[in-house]
Amino acid sequence: MSEKLVLIDGHSILNRAFYGVPDLSNSEGLHTNAVYGFLNILFKLLEEEKPEYLTVAFDVKAPTFRHEMYPEYKGTRKPMPQELHEQVPVMKQVLHAMGIRTMEQPGLEADDILGTLAKRAEKEGMDVSLVSGDRDLLQIASDKIKIRIPKTKGARTEVEDYYAADVEAKYGVTPAGFIELKALMGDTADNIPGVPKVGEKTASELLKQFRTLDNLYAHVEEVTKKAVRESLIANKDLAYLSLDLATIRIDSPVVLDWNEARLGELYTEDAYQLFRKLEFKNLLGRFEQKETKQDSLTAKIHVTSDLADAQEIFEAVKKAGHCGFAVLSDQKKCRKIEETEFCGLALCWGEEQIAVLPAEGFLTAQWLCSQLSDLYLAGIGLSTFEIKKAYPALLSNGEKDQDSCGTKTLFDVLIAVYLLNPLKNDYEPEDIAKEQLDRMIRTRKQLFEKLSLKEAYAQRPEEFYEYAGTLAYVCYAAMPVLSQKLEEAGMQKLFDEIEMPVSRVLYEMEKEGVLVRRQELQAYGDALVDRINELETKIHEAAGCEFNINSPKQLGEILFEKMGLKGGKKTKTGYSTAADILEKLAADNPIVADILEYRGLTKLKSTYADGLADYIEEDGRIHTSFNQTITATGRISSTEPNLQNIPMRTELGRLIRKVFVPKDNYLFTDADYSQIELRVLAHISGDEQLIEAYKSDADIHRITASKVFHTPFEEVTDLQRRNAKAVNFGIVYGISSFGLSQDLSITRKEAATYIEQYFATYPQVKTFLDKQVEDAKQNGYVTTLYGRRRPIPELKSSNFMQRSFGERVAMNSPIQGTAADIMKLAMIHVWEELHRRKLNSRLSLQIHDELLIETNRAEATEVAELLKDKMKHAAELSVSLEVDLHTGENWYDAK
């Protein structure tokens, strides 16, 4: 088997990491996000590639031979941001501490070093993986050289791989042809001129026809487009100059003994101390990892399909009193066990006690789930990863407590790590093992690539057992660690009394789903098409020609060149036709108003009329997924499909709600909190004026307008009320004078005056908001009324815009997060009361501040009363929580 060499383009990957990972810095103020992102990519590569050799090449500041050929080379590049620049020497220091060979050479770019080493290694029989964000290196790809282009977003890294065949499949040219493609089309990033009037599409077509640059110029008279032909002839020198500039040198005078690049012990004492200084707590666990630790864990996994053996295991779990478990099923939605591809259970009830029970023979899915459910009913402590997906099994023998969510003995490690670090993009078991237990476990992808669990069990049983057993172990071992951290952070009560119970409520809501009339949805879509076609005809007539309304380029040319409308902003790719540009022109230009309506309707058609139809299941219902661990503020989100962003601004958008209906003999009861965030602000700020305004039970926006604009309450105009409303809600989100000026179409000075007058009216609100910012700067986070933490790393940024964003987050998160917590409490109390009274009505949807119940007609009055009561009394604030309640035959009528 060939040895493997991994080559990394240092500056390129560091740059990708810098822009892909949110701003991070240590307590000394040193920016670290690029280094952190680079290391995550590096570790991922090492785990996937397992190379014998590794080298990282960096660019040097000095000019290269390309600058001698063309002084303007890379002349258009912006300077490296200071926050990134300061991390380059730190990155090199980290690599040196880990014993990783780095290279840089005056006169050469990193690409030339990498290209030379890659081709040399290929000749010597090695397999090569070259990692860079620069697609110029695709010209180096071959059957033995793989170009890997990572994309980093937050802590998540995905990689595109290209061998020679992949380059040709993607770009229609060979790797060698990729250089000639650049020679013709140029490269704005590197300021390679190329041939004027030849873009990527034209260049690709020319190379498909003529194969090479030399052959193209030998037959240049055969180029059919006159303008292109003339440009090619006039700019032949530029074409060949660009070819030279784009060509990576694979014969550079680079000296490297492969032994210098051979990987040794990465986790050295020097590297450990550096990681500590950089405060990479999540990565420190790697220094205590040895391969034997993983081996020792897998050796403890006991696999059995024997009924008697399995019964003994469940008895042992009962005696232990607590276990970690994994339901081995790939279901994406909450379903009955018989509707899922259930493969078995994994249990861990001690450091040495791990069992995997495949669903085969006498160990049927029903029997295994029944045994797990018995553990739950017996009050055994059970911890798992993503509890919602485990509820079908846990509840297969019925309810533990009919009157409550019954989650006191359950622990979801996913929810726990989310509360401790709500800024992560995703949470995986291997991350929990690494961060909480200092253990390395192999990822699902490493074990069986993209196979489903059912496929893995059939094709790679040993890897399946390893995955299942280690997952159960992580759920068992992480629980006490996470519990202690939640306690220390003051979030144990939040976890026990809000997050765990609401997970049960969300499971039931997903399972119930909401009924949708497919025929009415189709009719709604047809009506949209009719109006879209009318608008298209009208727009073309007004323009005097037919064009693609959906093409920003064509639309910009029609509006700002052909029709001569004023206010156009030209960019590199043409005129901007963004909504904010067009909205300013709509009042005076009917065609623009029609275009905006056209855009809105086409979005309604694609996203809702067509999009929702794809999610209607066999039962006629849409079963959305409610996400509990996505938003940093604690709000619940909805996906597949997103039912929380059903349009409300236009009547035609609102009409989509008519297709959502209750089942026969039922109606919808809809309750919506009134101004919950403003009421929360009044309570947590303690502002007496704002509290009194709410206690007066008068129009809060009219009261604010009266006070801010020094106008008697009865004489407040509609405009003053609208402006006061914008200020009221804007303050909650830390709005600036600029933001308010844009919202109200007033000057920045006027907006600043409004805000000053608002704070003069409600001084304790200003004091509260300022204190939130100061506390966040000192602690690194803000908290809700219920203890939920929202970290704000942006406050340590040297970038003014980032810091300003952080300040707005510090002001808003305690308010929005508290409102989200109150809504969750309301959902829990409503759900429990429906069950306590043994009613048939069920919660269907949660949309921000709104709850929708599918209500049995015989229970309508009782449900309306209990829904309003439980929402009003979900929290005891210094101002009352008010609820608007409606009923209807569909969601539209109930709203």
For each of these PLM feature ranges, what is it?
Residues M1-V131, R135-D161, L238-L241, T247-V255, ...:
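Noncatalytic, basic helical substrate-engagement surface that gates or grips nucleic-acid strands
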Residues S2, K50-T55, I100, K123, ...:
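Non-catalytic nucleic-acid-binding/docking modules located in mid-to-C-terminal regions
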Residues L14-G20, L138-D143, L345, K388-E399, ...:
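Short active-site loop/helix that positions an aromatic residue
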Residues R101, G154-K182, K300-I301, E338-C343, ...:
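Active-site-proximal helix-loop-helix substrate-binding element of RNase H-like nuclease domains
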Residues N235-A359, A378, L451-M648, L667, ...:
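Conserved "right-hand" nucleotidyltransferase catalytic core of DNA-directed polymerases
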Residues A346-E351, L420, Y427-L447, Y467-G469, ...:
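Function-dense linear segments that define catalytic or interfacial modules
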Residues K511, A609, H623-T624, Q628-T631, ...:
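Conserved catalytic core of nucleic-acid polymerases
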Residues D530, E534-T537, E541-A593, A760-R808, ...:
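C-terminal polymerase-core module
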